[in-house]
Amino acid sequence: GCVPPVLAAAGHGLHVFCEKPIALSFEDCREMVDACRDNHVVFMAGHVMNFFRGVRKAKELIGQGVIGDILYCHGARNAWEGTGASETWKKTRSKSGGHLYHHIHELDCVQFLMGGCPETVTMAGGNAAHRDDRFGDEDDMLFITMEYPDRRYAVLEYGSAFRWQEHYLLIQGTRGAIKIDMCSCGMTLKTGEKEEHFLVHRTKEEDDDRTRIYRETERDNGNQFGRPGRKPFLWLQGIMDEEMEFLNNVLHGAPVTDEFLPLLTGEAARNSIATADACTLSLKEDRKVKLSEIMK
């Protein structure tokens, strides 16, 4: 796990960059966050959705009041995985945490938009179509309901047992809505009778590259998992470049807006795992779980 190297780096006064998920339990996350805070070092997690141009534009539009107050977010990351996914460690729950943890990006993004962790969560799901040992032991269908104060909600769907592939984030407001679509890559703003379209990534070439990849892997989305020696996709290289440029600028003294502060302390990453842990407990005990039960 990441805990020993993060604690060692912090203890030596070194800044830390950690891939997501930073850990598979809230307690491990809290230990790492506390160590980095106590040693006054940056602790950044690889939550790359924060560096999508579309996500940045959506946050800008929301901040300007274009879609009003956010009422509801709906994220989906669904596909079909065949044997192309069987070679990767990500299919082993003890190593990756399963879809909810190793695909934590959408949950993290929703929490950034909604202002933090929900009050309560409920998760249903299980292994519907991948019971053969070749496919690992993670659940291939997960359905999450997140309840926030002031009657605001979010729903997340994750899984690898969906023949109709979807990957999007839908943000519903009192005056309009925004959809960030990663399959047919593009972002749409809808207000009244008006629609406006924006890029998700830096260029149309990167958006088209992502659309092409989803279409080519629709029959077996497991092919998308990275492997040593495989060149990153064009769109993925783009957001990695944006992320590393941001981190480099911060380490060289660039000012940081309030929006990104939780990304540099590990708190946003920790809070995402808190919600994931609450969801896991909900599924295990078949009940609604308060986040306060996890974040004691």
Regions found by a protein language model. Give the residues of each.
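Beta-loop-alpha module in the N-terminal Rossmann-like domain of NAD(P)-dependent dehydrogenases
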Residues: 1-35
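C-terminal capping/lid region of NAD(P)-dependent oxidoreductase domains
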Residues: 41, 68-72, 280-296
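C-terminal glycine/acidic-rich active-site capping loop/insertion
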Residues: 48, 175-267, 296
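Rossmann-fold dehydrogenase core element
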Residues: 31-48, 68-73
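Contiguous beta-strand/loop segments that form the cofactor/metal-binding neighborhood of enzyme cores
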Residues: 101, 107-194, 238-255, 277-279, ...
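Structural detector of well-ordered beta-strand residues that form the stable sheet scaffold
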Residues: 17, 42-44, 74, 122, ...
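A short helix->loop->beta-strand "cap" motif at the edges of active sites that frequently abuts
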Residues: 12-14, 39-41, 152
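Predominantly a Rossmann-like dinucleotide-binding segment in NAD(P)-dependent oxidoreductases
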Residues: 49-136, 286
